């Protein structure tokens, strides 16, 4: 009891499995949760993982974890941008966005809100994804 760990290599339960989220943001979020618990503000750590990487002329931004997916929706954007939306059944698990910060931010917020839009809406380039955040 009263043993805590935090950092980018500390493991945690996520989706019923023990994993490590090796990212700076996760290390910061875990440390904040541990600090809250140390001072008596009891709370569980329930992360909404996100990552980014610059690979030459491509900015990759990831929200969520795509493990266990069985369906992918692809959204083709402008100027060679693209995003991949990963689902298990009808539940949105993750979004990988290449050079598409708008899709990344919308996907991240949808995951945080627990919303899972239909694949057909994601793939429809004429559909305004931002409208999904309003309901």
Task: Give short role names for the model-derived ranges.
Residues 25-28, 114, 133:
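Generic low-complexity, intrinsically disordered sequence content enriched
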Residues 9-105:
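Mid-to-C-terminal Rossmann-like scaffold of FAD/NAD(P)H-dependent oxidoreductases
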Residues 116-135:
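Cysteine/selenocysteine-centered motifs that mediate thiol-based redox chemistry or coordinate metal-sulfur cofactors
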């Amino acid at each position: 009891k009263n043993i805590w760990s935090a950092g980018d290599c500390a493991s945690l339960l996520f989706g019923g499995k023990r994993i490590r989220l090796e990212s700076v943001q996760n290390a910061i979020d875990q440390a904040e949760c541990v600090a809250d618990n140390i001072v008596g503000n009891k709370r569980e750590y329930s992360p909404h993982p996100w990552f980014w990487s610059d690979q030459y002329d491509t900015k990759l931004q990831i929200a969520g974890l795509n493990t266990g997916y069985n369906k992918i929706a692809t959204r083709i954007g402008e100027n060679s941008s693209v995003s991949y939306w990963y689902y298990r059944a009808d539940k949105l698990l993750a979004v990988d966005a290449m050079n598409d910060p708008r899709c990344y931010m919308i996907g991240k917020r949808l995951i945080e809100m627990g919303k899972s839009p239909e694949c057909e809406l994601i793939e429809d380039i004429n559909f305004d994804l931002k409208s999904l955040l309003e309901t």
